[in-house]
């Protein structure tokens, strides 16, 4: 029998740290999903990325079963992590808060290209570089 999709939920959850508290509990509880079952499966799947903020797309079916897809961390979070910053610049065109090399931007683009809306590495690098510039990070 073919399962029909009841709801699709997009969340950002820290890897290995899912628990029934908000935002996970209310989002899944309203759809009738076993919250603890999701948390156990998610935490098991994200053991290697413990503590990193990971986007997840949860598909809930009519029989209250679910599946989920874990994506790469957001580009902005990866840039902040590599530059060892807490947040980006308030005025990115005037105040520069960090520096990053083109090689590091390329490595982020290679990891994130599967989640991006582009077809080649050159455009992915351009997107990551644009994000860095808008955060006030200087590209070397």
Curated annotation (Swiss-Prot):
Function per UniProt: Forms part of the ribosomal stalk which helps the ribosome interact with GTP-bound translation factors.
Organism: Karelsulcia muelleri (strain GWSS)
PTM notes: One or more lysine residues are methylated.
Family statement: Belongs to the universal ribosomal protein uL11 family.
SUPFAM superfamilies for the chain: Ribosomal L11/L12e N-terminal domain, Ribosomal protein L11, C-terminal domain
MF annotations from Gene Ontology: large ribosomal subunit rRNA binding; structural constituent of ribosome
Spans traversing the lipid bilayer: none
SMART domains: RL11
The keyword rRNA-binding belongs to this UniProt entry's keyword annotation: yes
GO process terms (BP): translation
Organism superkingdom: Bacteria
Subunit structure: Part of the ribosomal stalk of the 50S ribosomal subunit. Interacts with L10 and the large rRNA to form the base of the stalk. L10 forms an elongated spine to which L12 dimers bind in a sequential fashion forming a multimeric L10(L12)X complex.
Protein's name according to its UniProt entry: Large ribosomal subunit protein uL11
Keywords attached to this entry: Methylation, Ribonucleoprotein, Ribosomal protein, RNA-binding, rRNA-binding
GO cellular component: cytosolic large ribosomal subunit
UniProt xrefs under Gene3D superfamilies: Ribosomal protein L11, C-terminal domain, Ribosomal protein L11/L12, N-terminal domain
């Amino acid at each position: 029998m073919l399962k029909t999709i009841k709801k699709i939920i997009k969340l950002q959850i820290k890897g290995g740290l899912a628990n029934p508290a908000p935002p996970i509990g209310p989002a899944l509880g309203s759809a009738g999903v076993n919250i603890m079952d999701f948390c156990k499966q998610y935490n098991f799947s994200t053991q290697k990325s413990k503590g990193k903020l990971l986007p997840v797309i949860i598909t809930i079916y009519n029989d209250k079963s679910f599946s989920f897809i874990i994506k790469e961390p957001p580009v902005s979070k990866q840039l902040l992590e590599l530059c060892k910053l807490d947040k980006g610049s308030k005025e990115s065109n005037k105040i520069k808060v960090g520096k990053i090399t083109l090689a590091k931007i390329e490595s982020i683009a290679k990891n994130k290209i599967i989640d991006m809306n582009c077809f080649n590495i050159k455009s992915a690098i351009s997107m990551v570089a644009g994000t860095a510039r808008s955060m006030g990070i200087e590209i070397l």
